[in-house]
């Protein structure tokens, strides 16, 4: 554990960190990628370009400094990051590289003196050991499961199915013909790619979209404007191609008893982890109320509508409601949605009034903030609201 002097020294730097903001982590990443360019094969460079990862790292550093006397308060964040790290196959020696560049960044930007650098070195060492220990546990758990594996494993694309104008699903089965590890509904799969034309290896996480079956995996990918990986998958990946996958991971998952009511609330491609949850609830014959609330721009980009309806018909207590923000004339003629405009949960208050109900949210951050605010205003306990951010985590 850290001594009182080290803690006091680290906490004394908080005002400087806050004043500097993400400029600190921008300098850190620029320095690290200059001296250790091999790490570009691991980090999501798209998140570097748009600044999301720099902001996320700064928030993590500031949170650590603020809670250095209360490390248990950081454990939920540690779990989220450790799960993601295993999908990137982060190794203990890479923490030494990060530590070196973090201390060098503090020195180059602030010239704080050796006492401060030594204190931050000790503090970083404690945090790094927490991550290394937890990630070793996750790696062991993944390798020890039936159908589990270490590192990455080659899988063949056995199905590629357009689901909307923007979303395509991909099904994978292992090249070795063996079984595959189970996962919790809501978790994601690590997809490792370096096809011809890519400057660096690219690693992405995509939510698994159905109940585990031990035979293979299914994900669904939204084609993003300018998205290197999503566009390659949509336009160039074909049935028969081989990709490498890291084992399922993630701290966002559904774990409820059969008599626990559930609401699955999503927008756009945020429905993907919800599909795995709904599929699981349906196949396990969930007896309590299940709600499926989904928002989409219109019918052209609304994926998996038929699958959701089919699964819903197998549940004894199922309510579905779909909002289209800007429905097309065809949508209005066919009446394939329930409400026009933004999601308004107050109209469905009776369906979400059970105090035991668990709420799972996924979609753009602004949407989740909007939905969570409505839920709280309707009397839902914050502890019953669970959410997943695609990309670096943000607090709602």
From Swiss-Prot:
<comment type="similarity">
    <text>In the C-terminal section; belongs to the flavoprotein pyridine nucleotide cytochrome reductase family.</text>
</comment>
<feature type="binding site" description="proximal binding residue">
    <location>
        <position position="85"/>
    </location>
    <ligand>
        <name>heme b</name>
    </ligand>
</feature>
<feature type="binding site">
    <location>
        <begin position="204"/>
        <end position="207"/>
    </location>
    <ligand>
        <name>FAD</name>
    </ligand>
</feature>
<comment type="function">
    <text>Is involved in NO detoxification in an aerobic process, termed nitric oxide dioxygenase (NOD) reaction that utilizes O(2) and NAD(P)H to convert NO to nitrate, which protects the bacterium from various noxious nitrogen compounds. Therefore, plays a central role in the inducible response to nitrosative stress.</text>
</comment>
<comment type="similarity">
    <text>Belongs to the globin family. Two-domain flavohemoproteins subfamily.</text>
</comment>
<dbReference type="InterPro" id="IPR009050">
    <property type="entry name" value="Globin-like_sf"/>
</dbReference>
<dbReference type="GO" id="GO:0009636">
    <property type="term" value="P:response to toxic substance"/>
</dbReference>
<feature type="site" description="Influences the redox potential of the prosthetic heme and FAD groups">
    <location>
        <position position="388"/>
    </location>
</feature>
<dbReference type="InterPro" id="IPR008333">
    <property type="entry name" value="Cbr1-like_FAD-bd_dom"/>
</dbReference>
<feature type="binding site">
    <location>
        <position position="188"/>
    </location>
    <ligand>
        <name>FAD</name>
    </ligand>
</feature>
<keyword id="KW-0285">Flavoprotein</keyword>
<dbReference type="GO" id="GO:0019825">
    <property type="term" value="F:oxygen binding"/>
</dbReference>
<keyword id="KW-0274">FAD</keyword>
<keyword id="KW-0560">Oxidoreductase</keyword>
<dbReference type="Pfam" id="PF00970">
    <property type="entry name" value="FAD_binding_6"/>
</dbReference>
<keyword id="KW-0216">Detoxification</keyword>
<dbReference type="GO" id="GO:0046210">
    <property type="term" value="P:nitric oxide catabolic process"/>
</dbReference>
<dbReference type="GO" id="GO:0008941">
    <property type="term" value="F:nitric oxide dioxygenase NAD(P)H activity"/>
</dbReference>
<feature type="active site" description="Charge relay system">
    <location>
        <position position="135"/>
    </location>
</feature>
<dbReference type="InterPro" id="IPR012292">
    <property type="entry name" value="Globin/Proto"/>
</dbReference>
<feature type="active site" description="Charge relay system">
    <location>
        <position position="95"/>
    </location>
</feature>
<dbReference type="GO" id="GO:0005344">
    <property type="term" value="F:oxygen carrier activity"/>
</dbReference>
<dbReference type="Pfam" id="PF00042">
    <property type="entry name" value="Globin"/>
</dbReference>
<dbReference type="GO" id="GO:0046872">
    <property type="term" value="F:metal ion binding"/>
</dbReference>
<keyword id="KW-0408">Iron</keyword>
<keyword id="KW-0813">Transport</keyword>
<dbReference type="InterPro" id="IPR017938">
    <property type="entry name" value="Riboflavin_synthase-like_b-brl"/>
</dbReference>
<feature type="site" description="Involved in heme-bound ligand stabilization and O-O bond activation">
    <location>
        <position position="29"/>
    </location>
</feature>
<keyword id="KW-0561">Oxygen transport</keyword>
<dbReference type="InterPro" id="IPR017927">
    <property type="entry name" value="FAD-bd_FR_type"/>
</dbReference>
<protein>
    <recommendedName>
        <fullName>Flavohemoprotein</fullName>
        <ecNumber>1.14.12.17</ecNumber>
    </recommendedName>
</protein>
<keyword id="KW-0349">Heme</keyword>
<dbReference type="GO" id="GO:0071500">
    <property type="term" value="P:cellular response to nitrosative stress"/>
</dbReference>
<feature type="binding site">
    <location>
        <begin position="268"/>
        <end position="273"/>
    </location>
    <ligand>
        <name>NADP(+)</name>
    </ligand>
</feature>
<dbReference type="GO" id="GO:0020037">
    <property type="term" value="F:heme binding"/>
</dbReference>
<feature type="site" description="Influences the redox potential of the prosthetic heme and FAD groups">
    <location>
        <position position="84"/>
    </location>
</feature>
<feature type="region of interest" description="Reductase">
    <location>
        <begin position="147"/>
        <end position="396"/>
    </location>
</feature>
<feature type="domain" description="FAD-binding FR-type">
    <location>
        <begin position="150"/>
        <end position="255"/>
    </location>
</feature>
<keyword id="KW-0521">NADP</keyword>
<dbReference type="InterPro" id="IPR001433">
    <property type="entry name" value="OxRdtase_FAD/NAD-bd"/>
</dbReference>
<dbReference type="InterPro" id="IPR000971">
    <property type="entry name" value="Globin"/>
</dbReference>
<keyword id="KW-0479">Metal-binding</keyword>
